[in-house]
Amino acid sequence: MPSFDFTSEADMVGLKNAIDVTSRQIDNRYDFKGTSAKVELNEKDKVITLWGDSDFQLDQIKDLLFPAMEKKEKESVKRLDHQKVVSVSGNKVKQEMKIKDGIDSDLAKKIVKLVKDGKLKVQASIQGDTVRVQGAKRDDLQGCIALITKSITDFPIKYGNFRD
């Protein structure tokens, strides 16, 4: 019975590359000279930290970072969970953005419900942070992929692990 999985995993190599590109742009820009503007990635905790002198500067850093991220992985900005801007020593500010990885249980339940309501001849089951979809025909599975990618637009979902 053919099957595939819906997953949502961040491309950490592409993300690290986008942050390196942004750091180089910050170093080269005239308006960032002599400021504390920088971008850091904590791969272990999956957190991006933006440092700057003001909220405006954080917005400028985001304007550099987000297109670089989108270039590496489409819709990757949607997986960021923006935390509050925090004042740190002196007049500096920082903002953390957590990288949401995997499909949480609420989204998995939503996917299963959409598949069942779509009246396709497939079965969806939640397996940890993935959703496995099984069906008798490949055409049904392709219809399921089209339904889910059209319905869920607020979070980047990938499909793979096709089996015959």
Swiss-Prot record:
Entry's Gene Ontology molecular function annotations: nucleotide binding
Give the Pfam families listed for this entry. Answer: DUF520 (PF04461)
Q: Is this entry keyworded Nucleotide-binding?
A: yes
Asked if Nucleotide-binding is a keyword of the record, the answer is: yes
Q: Which Gene Ontology cellular component terms are annotated?
A: cytosol
The portions of this protein that span the membrane are none
> Do you know which SUPFAM superfamilies this protein is assigned to?
YajQ-like (SSF89963)
Q: Supply the InterPro entries for this chain.
A: DUF520, UPF0234-like_C, UPF0234_N, YajQ-like_sf
Q: Keyword annotations for this protein?
A: Nucleotide-binding
Q: What does this protein do?
A: Nucleotide-binding protein.
Q: Which family does it belong to?
A: Belongs to the YajQ family.
Q: What is this protein called?
A: Nucleotide-binding protein Daro_3028
